């Protein structure tokens, strides 16, 4: 009797422990058949940006091709269709990688509920992380870590298994004629590359070209100093174990390992505090005075479109719209600007990122925003307000990043591009004046913080 493997955010064949378990069980059953299935909600798919739609589609195409075009795709608003498919396929087991974020947990519970009385068991194993969320805890009382550094030390001490190769000796069940990969309903400005093979190639390129200087260059958006693997991790086209396995104690390797651990830390925090997906980790910040109404909506739209008049902010927002990705340093800059210069709630920015980032990860997105907003675990203090102009001079010293994404400023050849309003011809191509005075809004932000301080 065949077994179903439900692909989720683990769209790869290598180093997939849950898939290996499913394959081994199918071999032991004597049937040797595995039915690969992917479930998605077409309504949710429709709400994604064009780049996110294309990103998912290309990821699924690559997965499908890697298994001989046998992936069964189920489009349904709920888990009933997956349960019905399993019943019609006459299987007794559905295997999957366990999810630890609120949406993934809800999917698991919904499917288990639909399977009640069918005789079909849902088998959940492994996770999307090197160490399962909820595992790392203080040795004194078993409680969770609120601060990253001690979490990292405990996480590193626990360790992880070596990457596992795909189990041999099983077969994919041929796909039915009805199933097909979803087609994007929105356009994208370029062809998105995705899939396990591309992820492994990207990692090899990073190892050979950039990891040695990662510590120095990772904060420079004008350089290709990062791994560009966040998309692959978000889709599960590569597992963190694969990235961690070859790392040594060299400086660049250590810093890269610590960046992977930030992803694991945020996953742990969200698992233990599921309400923080869209609510404050530090509840007192709910009382912060944020701007609302028509004026706030107008400010949000200028931020979203990259027309604030602050080049570093606008370059980041335009990079997001044109590529579906944004450099991590710039994510912090635009987040600080939204919360502390525009006085808007972090959830508005997090939602925009969710709609547009091809590397969207629920835990990293929510808690990355809360870190910058000063209301999360181990957060940057609220009174730390990024100066978007100085950040530009520091991390894009020649202005190459800004010129790449803001063509209206391409005529300004040096670092002066970060303050074009100071030049006679700086705004001649229609780039807007700054929409606010940063020093004034910084003071306003700190004044609002005083209002919620515990007396």
What residue ranges belong to the model's regions?
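Active-site-proximal binding-pocket segments
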Residues: 224-247, 251-408
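Trp/Phe/Arg-rich N-terminal binding region typifying the photolyase-homology
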Residues: 1-163, 252, 318, 364, ...
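Short secondary-structure transition/capping segments
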Residues: 78-90, 114-124, 169-182, 376-381, ...
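Glycine/tryptophan-enriched, flexible segments
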Residues: 120, 141-288, 395-396, 400-455
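Hydrophobic alpha-helical segments, especially transmembrane helices
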Residues: 9, 109, 264, 330-332, ...
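Short, contiguous strand/loop micro-motifs
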Residues: 6, 50-51, 98-99, 215-216, ...
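Generic alpha-helical segment signature
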Residues: 56, 196, 306-309
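Short coil/turn segments at secondary-structure junctions
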Residues: 6, 47, 300, 429-432
């Amino acid at each position: 009797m065949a077994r179903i493997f439900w692909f989720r955010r683990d769209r790869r064949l290598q180093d997939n422990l849950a898939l290996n378990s499913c394959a081994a069980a199918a071999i032991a059953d004597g049937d040797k058949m595995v039915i690969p299935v992917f479930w998605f909600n077409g309504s949710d798919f429709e709400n994604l940006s064009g780049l996110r739609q294309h990103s998912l589609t290309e990821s699924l195409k690559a997965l499908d091709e890697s298994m001989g075009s046998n992936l069964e795709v189920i489009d349904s608003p709920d888990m009933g269709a997956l349960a019905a498919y399993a019943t019609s396929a006459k299987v007794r087991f559905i295997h999957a990688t366990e999810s630890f974020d609120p949406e993934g947990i809800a999917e698991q519970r919904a499917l288990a509920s639909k399977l009640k009385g069918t005789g079909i068991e849902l088998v959940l194993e492994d996770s999307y992380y090197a160490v399962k969320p909820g595992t790392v805890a203080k040795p004194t009382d078993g409680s969770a870590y609120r601060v990253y550094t001690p979490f990292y030390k405990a996480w590193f001490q626990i360790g992880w298994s070596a990457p596992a190769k795909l189990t041999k000796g099983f077969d994919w069940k041929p796909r039915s004629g009805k199933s097909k990969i979803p087609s994007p309903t929105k356009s994208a400005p370029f062809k998105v590359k995705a899939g396990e093979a591309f992820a492994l190639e990207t990692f090899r390129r990073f190892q050979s070209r950039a990891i040695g200087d990662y510590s120095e260059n990772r904060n420079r958006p004008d350089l290709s100093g990062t791994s560009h693997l966040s998309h692959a991790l978000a889709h599960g086209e590569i597992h963190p174990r694969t990235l961690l396995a070859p790392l040594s104690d060299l400086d660049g390797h250590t810093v890269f390992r610590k960046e992977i651990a930030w992803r694991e830390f945020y996953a742990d925090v969200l698992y233990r505090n599921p309400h923080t997906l869209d609510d404050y980790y530090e509840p007192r910040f709910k009382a912060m005075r944020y701007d609302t109404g028509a004026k706030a909506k107008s400010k949000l739209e200028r931020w979203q479109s990259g027309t604030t008049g602050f080049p570093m902010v606008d370059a980041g927002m335009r990079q997001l719209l044109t590529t579906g990705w944004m450099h991590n340093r710039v994510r912090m800059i635009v987040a600080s600007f939204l919360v502390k210069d525009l006085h808007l709630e972090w959830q508005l920015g997090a939602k925009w990122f969710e709609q547009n980032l091809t590397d969207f990860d629920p835990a990293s997105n929510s808690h990355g925003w809360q870190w910058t907003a000063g209301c999360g675990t181990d957060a940057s203090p609220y009174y730390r307000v990024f100066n978007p102009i100085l950040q530009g001079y520091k991390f894009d010293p020649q202005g190459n990043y800004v010129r790449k994404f803001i063509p209206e400023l391409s005529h300004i050849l040096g670092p002066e591009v970060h303050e074009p309003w100071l030049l006679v011809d700086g705004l001649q191509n229609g780039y807007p004046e700054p929409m606010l005075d940063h020093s004034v809004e910084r003071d306003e932000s700190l004044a609002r913080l005083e209002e919620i301080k515990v007396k």
